Curated annotation (Swiss-Prot):
<feature type="active site" description="Proton acceptor">
    <location>
        <position position="78"/>
    </location>
</feature>
<dbReference type="InterPro" id="IPR000763">
    <property type="entry name" value="Catalase_peroxidase"/>
</dbReference>
<dbReference type="GO" id="GO:0020037">
    <property type="term" value="F:heme binding"/>
</dbReference>
<feature type="cross-link" description="Tryptophyl-tyrosyl-methioninium (Trp-Tyr) (with M-226)">
    <location>
        <begin position="77"/>
        <end position="200"/>
    </location>
</feature>
<dbReference type="Pfam" id="PF00141">
    <property type="entry name" value="peroxidase"/>
</dbReference>
<dbReference type="GO" id="GO:0005829">
    <property type="term" value="C:cytosol"/>
</dbReference>
<dbReference type="InterPro" id="IPR019794">
    <property type="entry name" value="Peroxidases_AS"/>
</dbReference>
<dbReference type="InterPro" id="IPR019793">
    <property type="entry name" value="Peroxidases_heam-ligand_BS"/>
</dbReference>
<dbReference type="InterPro" id="IPR010255">
    <property type="entry name" value="Haem_peroxidase_sf"/>
</dbReference>
<comment type="subunit">
    <text>Homodimer or homotetramer.</text>
</comment>
<keyword id="KW-0575">Peroxidase</keyword>
<dbReference type="GO" id="GO:0004096">
    <property type="term" value="F:catalase activity"/>
</dbReference>
<keyword id="KW-0408">Iron</keyword>
<comment type="function">
    <text>Bifunctional enzyme with both catalase and broad-spectrum peroxidase activity.</text>
</comment>
<comment type="similarity">
    <text>Belongs to the peroxidase family. Peroxidase/catalase subfamily.</text>
</comment>
<dbReference type="InterPro" id="IPR002016">
    <property type="entry name" value="Haem_peroxidase"/>
</dbReference>
<keyword id="KW-0560">Oxidoreductase</keyword>
């Protein structure tokens, strides 16, 4: 058995998130194009196949009410609902619900059966239909089959075949524990759920108690971290709870076995074995809470909202030993059908999280408005559901299939279509010359391009240089972008753009988004030339400029970096070690350890640092693309001494004279301290390493500049 080095040396830097960016664990051919394969599907045929299995109840796991639709809705919701805005991680893409740890979360109990029911559909369409898409599509088909009109569906989610090691799910080591709140009672970022192993909040209430006010507060915080406002939150909960029931025929602690990750091998990946009664149908145990929300659990109607608002609800312990709510005088007892179609009736119940919506004045106002306006409720749920299941997919260019709505919504970060011709090689050369002849230095050109492009997050495919949103709020006011200096730089860019565009007699124009990237490319080429290397940085025009109306300021605020080690920037809000934040930023940029290393070394050589600090600029020729950063970080003629107790800034001193040569931060020193990063740095810091360094920097720089160019795929 290999040693778990993370436990042996917990302070060592963890590169698992970056390593997965370099690994190919997908059994499909590396040249396989899922987008192309998906569009070969007859989506209507796929939906018919899903609906067929949805109403074909299996003896080994009977469908509640003869219809797997409610189970499929829960499956789709819990797949997409892991998304959080703070770092863009989670969500339906990747199909992580079928992989650990998510497949074994208590909140996903018995969803393994839902995926097994769907296997014949997945088996039929194979590589043309990912699990990630199928899970979400099944939720949509379920809603439609029970009388609800959905807003649309987009495919394009590829499957992953290993857990996402970049996601911080929380500090707890036990499921359903909640040790994540800080001393001030705040849920730390980037977490979205309030409890380990749950998608959002404890349905019984905070800490398993029926506290309505506390439950409403948890709901608002958790759904807010998923980018949902109060109306969307109420619409999602009310819409989802219109269907199906929860299962708690008896106490899960006494009757239910472990999740898939802990199940015996003969169960073949099925978890939560239940020895109560038949272990299925009316005897099913999932959450430990028991009952439906209404008397029509397989049809779209207003009964959930009507029941919640029109009756008084009181807490009680259900048959599974969990807190749930019943009507005050039992008006809805024995009112709902049994899951197996028998003559025995079931009691209608509510969760603490349901009644919390009624107690909270803001949520209640939305509920009452929906009750009075059913069409408004239908539309709100349709759009909130669409947002839920597509939030992590990025811009509309990635949305595939015949059911993609024509309307682009603000949360999709829309961009305008170009109503002009893009620049060609001749114009590119002309504009490069104008940029290099301007008052902007190499460092300014590089920093502006980096600030624009490095907002990209591969987690949810948001951000990037396309749109030139760096000139709009909130990005132009972010501390990391040095607002005053950025404003001056943008003024120069806009003047060059205006002069070029106004001089054209044809339809060729340059967008500011393209011009900013081109400026960075030109600066890199100039810096390489000054170091003796003739390079051309690849450039593909076609970016357009977003408008303020196309930019949700609050939504984009989630992209603001608390640290950017590539620019040697660390804010007061940063709560983790700088080197850990550097790795996290590199992962969001889909970089590997060598790519992260070469970018930092190049940015330092170019002098592209926050507030033009000399920290980390280990060269006498800033603005020249040399390997000096690596040469000097590896030089044993020097030693490092901290200049403060927090050991975040250090002085590089000559061992013999004690003279201070340079200053650096933990962002810099990690490349000499960490054994893996030092090994990579040695390649670039060797006497024959500079040419390789320049080539690799150009390749990686170009990669970052076009991370968001889904229009080129």
């Amino acid at each position: 058995m290999s040693i778990d080095y993370k436990k042996l040396w917990p302070e060592a830097l963890d590169f698992e998130s970056l390593d997965q960016n370099a690994q190919h664990v997908d059994p499909k051919d590396e040249d396989f194009d899922y987008a192309e394969a998906f569009q070969e599907l007859d989506l209507e045929e796929v939906k018919q196949d899903i609906e067929s299995v949805m109403t074909d109840s299996q003896e080994w796991w009977p469908a509640d009410y003869g219809h797997y639709g409610p189970l499929f809705i829960r499956m789709a919701w819990h797949s997409a609902g892991t998304y959080r805005t703070t770092d863009g991680r989670g969500g339906a893409s990747g199909g992580y619900q079928r992989l650990p740890p998510v497949d074994s979360w208590p909140d996903n109990a018995n969803l393994d059966k839902a995926r097994r029911v769907l296997w014949p559909v997945k088996q039929k369409y194979g590589q043309n239909l990912s699990w990630a898409d199928l899970i979400v599509l099944a939720g949509n088909v379920a809603l439609e089959s029970m009388g609800f009109e959905t807003f649309g569906f987009a495919g394009g989610r590829e499957d992953d075949f290993a857990p996402d090691e970049s996601v911080d799910w929380g500090p707890e080591e036990e499921m359903e524990a909640s040790d994540r709140y800080d001393e001030a009672g705040e849920l730390p970022e980037p977490l979205g759920a309030t409890v380990m192993g749950l998608i959002y909040v404890n349905p019984e209430g905070p800490d398993g108690e029926p506290d309505l006010e506390g439950s409403a507060a948890n709901i608002r915080e958790s759904f807010g971290r998923m980018a949902m406002n109060d109306e969307e939150t109420v619409a999602l909960i009310a819409g989802g709870h219109t269907f199906g029931k929860v299962h708690g025929a008896d106490d899960p602690d006494e009757h239910v076995g472990g999740p898939p990750a802990d199940a015996p091998i003969d169960l073949q990946g099925l978890g939560w074995e239940n020895d109560f009664g038949e272990g299925k149908g009316p005897d099913t145990i999932t959450s430990g809470i028991e009952g439906p929300w209404n008397t029509t659990p397989t049809q779209w109607d207003m009964s959930y909202i009507d029941n919640l608002l029109d009756y008084e609800w009181w807490p009680e312990k259900g048959p599974g030993g969990a807190w749930q709510w019943t009507t005050e005088s039992g008006e809805l007892d024995a009112a709902a059908p049994s899951v197996d179609g028998s003559s025995e009736k079931e009691d209608v119940m509510m969760l603490t999280t349901d009644v919390a919506l009624k107690r909270d004045p803001d949520y209640r106002e939305v509920l009452e408005r929906f009750q009075e306006n059913p069409d408004e409720f239908q539309e709100a749920f349709a759009k909130a559901w669409y947002k839920l299941i597509h939030r992590d997919m990025g811009p509309p260019e990635r949305f595939l299939g015949p059911e993609v709505p024509e309307e682009t919504l603000i949360w999709q970060d829309p961009l305008p279509d170009a109503d002009y011709d893009s620049i060609g090689d001749e114009e590119v050369a002309e504009l490069k010359e104008a940029l290099l002849d301007s008052e902007l230095s190499v460092a300014q050109l590089v920093k502006t391009a980096w600030a624009s492009a490095s907002t990209y997050r591969d987690s949810d495919k948001r951000g990037g240089a396309n749109g030139a949103r760096i000139r709009l709020e909130p990005q132009r006011s972010w501390e990391v972008n040095e607002p005053a200096a950025l404003a001056d730089a943008l003024e120069t860019y806009e003047a060059i753009q205006e002069e070029f565009n106004s001089a054209r007699s044809d339809a060729v124009r340059v967008s500011l988004a393209d011009l900013i990237v081109l400026g960075g490319n030109a600066a890199v080429e100039q810096a390489a030339a000054d170091a003796g290397y003739d390079v051309t940085v690849p450039f593909e025009p076609g970016r357009t400029d977003a408008t303020p109306e196309q930019t949700d300021v609050e939504s984009f605020e989630a992209l603001k970096p608390k640290a950017d080690g590539f620019r040697n920037y660390l804010s007061d809000e940063a709560e983790r070690k700088p080197e850990e934040l550097l790795v996290d930023k590199a992962d969001l940029l889909n970089l590997t350890p060598p790519e992260m290393t070469v970018l930092v070394g190049g940015m330092r050589a170019l002098g592209a640092t926050y507030q033009d600090t000399d920290r980390g600029v280990f060269t006498d020729e800033p603005g020249t693309l040399t390997n000096d950063f690596f040469v000097n970080i590896l030089d044993m003629d020097y030693e490092w001494e901290p200049v403060s107790e927090d050991r975040e800034v250090f002085e590089l001193r000559d061992r013999e004279t004690g003279e201070v040569e340079w200053e650096g931060t933990r962002f810099d020193l990690i490349f000499g301290s960490d054994s893996r990063l030092r090994a990579i740095s040695e390649v670039y810091g060797a006497d024959d390493g500079e040419a390789e360094f320049v080539e690799d920097f150009v390749d990686t720089w170009s990669k970052v500049m076009k991370l968001d160019r889904f229009d080129l795929e």
